[in-house]
Amino acid sequence: MKEKTCQTRCGTIHYWASVSNPDTITLVFLPGLTADHRLFDKQIQYFENIYNVIVWDAPAHASSWPFRFDFDLFDKAKWLNDILNQEGITRSVIIGQSMGGYVGQAYAQLYPDKMTGFISIDSAPLQRSYVTAVEIWLLKRMEPVYAHYPWKWLLKSGSEGVATTDYGRNLMREMMLTYDGNQKRYAQIAGHGYRILAAAMEKDLPYEIKCPALLMCGTQDHAGSCIRYNKVWHRNTKIPLTWIEGAGHNSNTDRPERVNRSIEEFVANIS
């Protein structure tokens, strides 16, 4: 994996790529809010010698800093497209965990024919019809919660709340410690992320996935209403849904072998 950069009007995005043949399948891993490229370590280790792989530190996250908080979800999708073009990628399978899954859906809205596949890991649908007005109202007002909550408790609840295994919890804690001593930045990243998510929902666009897709969700995912959303998303769209037994919100860190197998089977069917 080689660390690379992509310049934007708001700052520089850092990403890691291993691309041997850009005309073959490329797995594009998008971590969730406040997580960074390390979220997918177990996937990168497994797949980097099988497929092309790309993973980023999302805008304003970890090494993609300094970065102005003057962008929306569609800017993120456009910058992702810039990275894929920069690498000459023609067959991308976008694999988004949580917020990364929302970026994937925004990408599908902007570039409906450019994705070869889409995998949502513990994410949820972006369509307005799935969320209540109260949920949108709350999303817009999360930053003060993260700014004023004691950091020690945030670290504990943030890591224990998203994973069921020691590996998953320790990894999330390590990623959160990137912002140790700068809780304001952590709160800004989280608050801004939730606001641009709410704004994308309020746009009330179709966000239709036109390529083969797969939903994955941990059976112990207690972040928001992920389990409920995935059931309805599956029911309404008929996109296959795979439950990751015993896994939390970061299910790819709790049950990497199970998640890797599902990704492998999915890609084999579309190759």
PLM feature spans:
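Gly/Ala-rich beta-loop-alpha elbow adjacent to hydrolase catalytic centers
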Residues: 96, 100, 104
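Post-His helix in hydrolase/transferase enzymes
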Residues: 253-265
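Flexible "cap/lid" loop of the alpha/beta hydrolase fold
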Residues: 109, 116-146
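Active-site loop/oxyanion-hole signature of alpha/beta-hydrolase fold enzymes
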Residues: 54-95, 261
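Conserved alpha/beta-hydrolase catalytic His-Asp/Glu region
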Residues: 129-131, 148-208
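Conserved HGGG/HGGXW glycine-rich cap/lid loop of the alpha/beta-hydrolase fold
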Residues: 11-66
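Conserved loop-alpha-helix segment in the C-terminal half of the alpha/beta-hydrolase fold
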Residues: 213-247, 253
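N-terminal cap/lid segment of alpha/beta-hydrolase-fold proteins
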Residues: 1-12
